[in-house]
Amino acid sequence: MVSYLDFEKPVAELQTRIAELRKATSDEMDLDREISDLEVKVQKLLRDTYAHLTPWQKTQVARHPERPHFHDYISALCEEFIPLAGDRLFGEDEAIIGGLARIDGQRVMIIGQEKGNDTASRLKHNFGMARPEGYRKAIRLMKLADRFGLPVITLVDTSGAFPGIDAEERGQAEAIARSTETCLSLGVPLISVIVGEGGSGGAIAIAAANRLLMFEHAVYSVISPEGCASILWRDAGKASDAATAMKLTATDLYGLGIVDRIVLEPVGGAHRDPKTAIDALKMALLQELAFLKPMDRDALRSMRRKKFLDIGG
């Protein structure tokens, strides 16, 4: 059953009515026509609602617990996936998953944050908030891909890097900086996709790419709206105002030249139809790979650096 967000209350009410009618249907009472009419209304209401989402509402959609996560993308995108673990310096961080994969027969290295989809998996993956060893693992895998000439694909979905004392003691800031530096220095294509939340340095550490793609209802920002509101107005309740001011939506960021391509989602968001959303992403990735793979190493590096130097120019 879909979890409804606050602004989806009218949709939830219609769906409840449909469920009641289905339960009441019997041989003596045919309610198929009424149910069909209500289903049409639901689709229209969803379409109208999602066509006019505010930035804060998009933030809620990006955080939806039923939105596809890294393992869902791997299962649907890749014919083959061989996970690689550990940073060879401290240990394994399961907030970041990565490994060798084949997408439509093409060999790639794929890396991304995994938030988890239930209590146990969320704790296991630390809600997608990586520690230094997670970013150092990403560095190791990116360098491995560079050595073997494999394109790198990263899927970003994190509220940010883990801010705990243990992470700081092990060099969180340095690990994020080194990971960003590694992204910029690769001589192979690097394609990054913001699939849900793209939060702060924890996101950009694996997203300094040749091409940055973003799902229609994803968000990408230097801080969460709640954090921004707490700093600017000392009131996290003003998160909606902060989200609007931060320009964190795919449309805003595409207009600013930060995002290169918006991947459209099914009506009602990727969580309502994961297969359609992932199929759209696969098509976009294959097109981007076809564009980038013929480029030589120097051209790829120059393209990546120019992209970031031009931001704000």
Swiss-Prot record:
**Where is it located?**
Cytoplasm
Q: Which residues form a coiled coil?
A: none
Report if keyword Transmembrane is assigned.
no
The protein's GO terms of the molecular function aspect are: acetyl-CoA carboxylase activity; ATP binding; carboxyl- or carbamoyltransferase activity
Instruction: Report the enzyme's class at the first EC level.
Output: transferase
- The principal location of this protein is cytoplasm
Give residue ranges for domain CoA carboxyltransferase C-terminal: 30-291
Q: Do the record's keywords include Lipid biosynthesis?
A: yes
Alphabetical keyword list: ATP-binding, Cytoplasm, Fatty acid biosynthesis, Fatty acid metabolism, Lipid biosynthesis, Lipid metabolism, Nucleotide-binding, Transferase
> Which Pfam families does the record associate with it?
ACCA
List cystine links: none
Q: Please state the pathway this protein functions in, per its UniProt record.
A: Lipid metabolism; malonyl-CoA biosynthesis; malonyl-CoA from acetyl-CoA: step 1/1
For this UniProt entry, what's an example GO CC term? acetyl-CoA carboxylase complex
The entry sums up its family as follows: Belongs to the AccA family.
Query: Partners and quaternary state?
Result: Acetyl-CoA carboxylase is a heterohexamer composed of biotin carboxyl carrier protein (AccB), biotin carboxylase (AccC) and two subunits each of ACCase subunit alpha (AccA) and ACCase subunit beta (AccD).
Q: What is this protein called?
A: Acetyl-coenzyme A carboxylase carboxyl transferase subunit alpha
Q: Which organism is it from?
A: Zymomonas mobilis subsp. mobilis (strain ATCC 31821 / ZM4 / CP4)
The organism's lineage is: Bacteria, Pseudomonadati, Pseudomonadota, Alphaproteobacteria, Sphingomonadales
User: Gene for this protein?
Assistant: accA
